[in-house]
Amino acid sequence: MGAETQPAEPGVRDLAEVDEPAFTGLAQRHRRELHVHCYRMLGSFEDAEDTVQETFLRAWRRRETFAGRSTFRAWLYRIATNACLDLLAKCRPEPATGGEVRWLQPYPDRLLDELPAAGADEPETVAVARETIELAYLVAVQHLAPRPRAVLILRDVLGWPAKEVAELLGDSVNSVNSALQRARAGMREHLPAQRQDWTGDETDTRTRELVRRFTDAAVAKDVGALAAMLRDDVRCSMPPTPGLQIGRDAVVSDWIADGFESLGSLRAVPTAVNRQPAVAFYLWQDSDGAYLPLTVDALRVTGGAITEIVTFHADQFPRLGLPERLPADRTP
């Protein structure tokens, strides 16, 4: 894989005399990319938010240690990575049997759009930025031990040289290279063998049409039509709720057992998370006289079929910028 590229950073030499407002202004330029970095490390939007705040606090307190030997951006990444490792050392959750990552949270595309633009003339760079934020990648990377995880993200996603990663982690270059090989092997174990099976399709006309048909069938509660869009080995999960369903029959049986066909009136709003198509569903509530948030389905589409559905609970709607309610436009 190639690595993400970033625009050149204006020189920052001496932070000792910088006041807090000026320092905050410098740091805030990098907030979104640091947040995405912490999100890759932790798999949780909320934990990433807390860790970025901790990063800025540590950076302000240690500003006199910045000697200008690296860029200010690299210095912040160093602090952020160590803050993530500290958090994981305190309370590292273990993926459940079968590969579930119950703390996984979605990342809104509207916030990913705030990232500095990767080189449009470098297709591999653009692909890395997209693929390494998709949910399948996030789930796989959470299975790695924290330090190999950090090495993988710094080397393969951000493109840091092994020497700089070694300095950040206080390891030798040989140790970093060994950790990278272990991390890559772990990713191969937890990702499908074929790259297109875990990256999904680009959002092309065929994918958009499939998502539209999925949305229509879900609103109609047409289980047969939904089943026809699933690949035989489809995976379905709903973090943080336990339970990973694998295979079309298992997924459909779970829908039926959960009473999907007897739900009340539904409405849907298209959205996007983690550079994947998603659909937000709303359920009619008589007591409120409106459609209220139900779930968000993030879809992975490969070869014209749905290969994974990750369903998130209604508490994610505000972060995704989705409406709190939808008005009645017909008699439910």
Describe the residue ranges of each PLM region:
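Hydrophobic-face residues of short alpha-helical interaction/recognition segments
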Residues: 34, 38, 76, 80-88
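Solvent-exposed, charged amphipathic helical/linker segments at domain boundaries
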Residues: 162-168, 173-267
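Conserved RNAP core-binding helix
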Residues: 35, 45-62, 77, 158
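Sigma70-family region 2
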Residues: 17, 41-45, 54-72, 86-94, ...
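Low-complexity, glycine/alanine/valine/leucine- and proline-rich hydrophobic stretches
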Residues: 252-332
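A short, charge-rich alpha-helical start-of-domain segment used by transcription regulators
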Residues: 13-36, 46-49, 60
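Short, basic/polar amphipathic helix motif occurring as a linker/hinge flanking DNA-binding modules
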Residues: 88-109, 191-199
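A short pre-motif secondary-structure segment
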Residues: 151-152
